Swiss-Prot record:
Record organism: Sendai virus (strain Fushimi)
Region (L protein binding): 412-445, 413-445
Region (Disordered): 1-23, 38-320, 495-516
Subcellular locations according to the entry: Host cytoplasm
Short name of one Pfam family: Paramyxo_P
Note: The P/V/C gene has two overlapping open reading frames. One encodes the P/V/W proteins and the other the C/Y proteins.
Main location: host cell
Record flagged with keyword Ribosomal protein: no
Keyword Disulfide bond annotated: no
Name of the protein: Phosphoprotein
PTM summary: Phosphorylated by PKC/PRKCZ, and other unknown kinases. Phosphorylation is necessary for viral transcription and replication. The N-terminus contains the majority of phosphorylated sites. Ser-249 is the major site of phosphorylation, but is not necessary for most functions.
Function per UniProt: Essential cofactor of the RNA polymerase L that plays a central role in the transcription and replication by forming the polymerase complex with RNA polymerase L and recruiting L to the genomic N-RNA template for RNA synthesis. Also plays a central role in the encapsidation of nascent RNA chains by forming the encapsidation complex with the nucleocapsid protein N (N-P complex). Acts as a chaperone for newly synthesized free N protein, so-called N0, allowing encapsidation of nascent RNA chains during replication.
Alphabetical GO biological process terms: DNA-templated transcription; negative stranded viral RNA transcription; viral genome replication
Length: 568
């Protein structure tokens, strides 16, 4: 009965108020809807929402939702983005003027009074808290220009700036981080939220301080399209109710206590990225945390006005790059790659140039470019060295092959020399007797195989040995070439000259001759002896005059004696 009386009292206040009083009525109805549709344990657990002002014209309505264990959804009509109600309002009432919407609202209130005979909590629950469409506009037009709730504010911001949503998708961040609280799934009638809890927030949120104009149907359609793409990212990590309020409570309390100018736009995306429960995606973002940033650091474009921190960080990065270059030069010097650190800084080699540029890089793109250049230059230098090594190996192989040819020819030449030496040794063994006699075992001296005429040694008749022709420098002289002093003694000079022509060679001894072979050989012995020229001529002349063998023997004995006297 108290609740019905409270509703009737509010209805009477609505009748006395101007048409602009619908804002307080919707707040009250949303308050009752929250009371009736939630369990007593949930209401007794957290009563922070009781302290929020309901009908204050300065701030927006309660901007938070609460979901109890996946059961009923508690939300204020001024902030709840009811999917079915939003679609029906956009599709059916986008062209309806605000006056008709206000008239329809009053008709719904009259219908509610007509059924006021039913008393008790059941009738109120059937009219207000059944979870369906109660006929009351849950999101009335913003006639007074009050700030919208946080969810709608972010939805319109994301619709106006679709590039922010593209950044979220490109960086792989969950949309709950930048897009604010999640919206219920449309497929289940708005009654379930897939286990995702709503993050409660204060009415004086940092993102809702700007005054927005009346939303256009295009913006609402953009919001609906954004919310329809939400189930594709349902697998992302949901925000837990234990961590989300703790991470956002400092900025909410700060803005709630200090206040902010009415022209303040929603906070930038970096505040949501740098929160405690989200991974640090941007490594090179050197912006200070939320608690240390001032209110005036965020202009309309979302970028900081004062570049002091960025300049300091840039100078710090340059100092770090310089120190890293010094460390790299020291390391290369210690490893023996370069002689000194000055060589690393002043070298014009491609690898060193790209290494210095990579160490001085200001962002990842430049560093990646320089590292790629470093790798390619190192690969090029290594390929060049490989080619040089191949050429060197080829030259070494050619020289080895030439050495093999030289060794082969030298070995063949050595074999020829060895065979020639062995043949000379065998010839020398034939000429000289190395004591192979069986009858003269006492004497150890070597006896020559060719014996000269001597008085002591006449035991063996000596025959002419043709091998004497090859001894020393003695050359074969033809038989019939006479000396000049013998010309006067030639009886028939024409006949002698005629016989000289065919015998003027070493092969003349093979031709038939009138002279006996023995006489011819004796003459050769005399000619090859070390006697003087006159003595040789005298002995040859006396030998030619011999008629018997005894005379020849006597002449040869005289020749041998003269030879012995010369040799001794």
């Amino acid at each position: 009965m108290d609740q019905d009386a409270f509703i009737l009292k509010e209805d009477s206040e609505v009748e006395r108020e101007a048409p602009g009083g619908r804002e307080s009525l919707s707040d009250v109805i949303g308050f009752l809807d929250a009371v009736l549709s939630s369990e007593p344990t949930d209401i007794g657990g957290d009563r922070s929402w009781l302290h929020n002002t309901i009908n204050t014209p300065q701030g927006p309505g309660s901007a938070h939702r609460a979901k109890s264990e996946g059961e009923g959804e508690v939300s204020t009509p001024s902030t709840q983005d009811n999917r079915s109600g939003e679609e029906s309002r956009v599709s059916g009432r986008t062209s309806k003027p605000e006056a008709e919407a206000h008239a329809g609202n009053l008709d719904k209130q009259n219908i509610h009074r007509a059924f006021g005979g039913r008393t008790g909590t059941n009738s109120v629950s059937q009219d207000l808290g059944d979870g369906g469409d109660s006929g009351i506009l849950e999101n009335p037009p913003n006639e007074r220009g009050y700030p919208r709730s946080g969810i709608e504010d972010e939805n319109r911001e994301m619709a106006a700036h679709p590039d922010k949503r593209g950044e979220d998708q490109a960086e792989g961040l969950p949309e709950e981080v930048r897009g604010g609280t999640s919206l219920p799934d449309e497929g289940e009638g708005g009654a379930s939220n897939n286990g995702r809890s709503m993050e409660p927030g204060s009415s004086h949120s940092a993102r809702v301080t700007g005054v927005l104009v009346i939303p256009s149907p295009e913006l609402e359609e953009a919001v609906l399209r954004r919310n329809k793409r939400r189930p594709t990212n349902s697998g992302s990590k949901p925000l837990t109710p234990a961590t989300v309020p703790g991470t956002r409570s400092p900025p909410l309390n700060r803005y709630n206590s200090t206040g902010s100018p009415p022209g303040k736009p929603p906070s930038t995306q970096d505040e949501h990225i740098n929160s405690g429960d989200t991974p640090a995606v941007r490594v090179k973002d050197r912006k200070p945390p939320i608690g240390t940033r001032s209110v005036s650091d965020c202009p309309a474009n979302g970028r900081p006005i004062h570049p002091g921190l960025e300049t300091d960080s840039t100078k710090k990065g340059i100092g770090e790059n310089t120190s890293s270059m010094k460390e790299m030069a020291t390391l290369l010097t210690s490893l023996g790659v370069i002689q000194s650190a000055q060589e690393f800084e002043s070298s014009r080699d491609a690898s060193y140039v790209f290494a210095r540029r990579a160490l001085k890089s200001a962002n990842y793109a430049e560093m990646t470019f320089n590292v790629c250049g470093l790798i390619l230059s190192a690969e090029k230098s290594s390929a060049r060295k490989v080619d040089e090594n191949k050429q060197l190996l080829k030259q070494i192989q050619e020289s080895v092959e030439s050495f093999r040819d030289i060794y082969k020819r030298f070995s063949e030449y050595q074999k020829e020399q060895n065979s020639l030496l062995m043949s000379n040794l065998s010839t020398l063994h034939i000429i000289t007797d190395r004591g192979g006699k069986t009858d003269n075992t006492d004497s150890l001296t070597r006896s020559p195989s060719v014996f000269a005429k001597s008085k002591e040694n006449k035991t063996k008749a000596t025959r002419f040995d043709p091998s004497m022709e090859t001894l020393e420098d003695m050359k074969y002289k033809p038989d019939l070439i006479r000396e000049d002093e013998f010309r006067d003694e030639i009886r028939n000079p024409l006949y002698q000259e005629r016989d000289t022509e065919p015998r003027a060679s070493n092969a003349s001894r093979l031709l038939p001759s009138k002279e006996k072979p023995t006489m011819h050989s004796l003459r050769l012995v005399i000619e090859s002896s070390p006697l003087s020229r006159a003595e040789k001529a005298a002995y040859v002349k006396s030998l030619s005059k011999c008629k018997t063998d005894q005379e020849v023997k006597a002449v040869m004995e005289l020749v041998e004696e003269d030879i012995e006297s010369l040799t001794n």
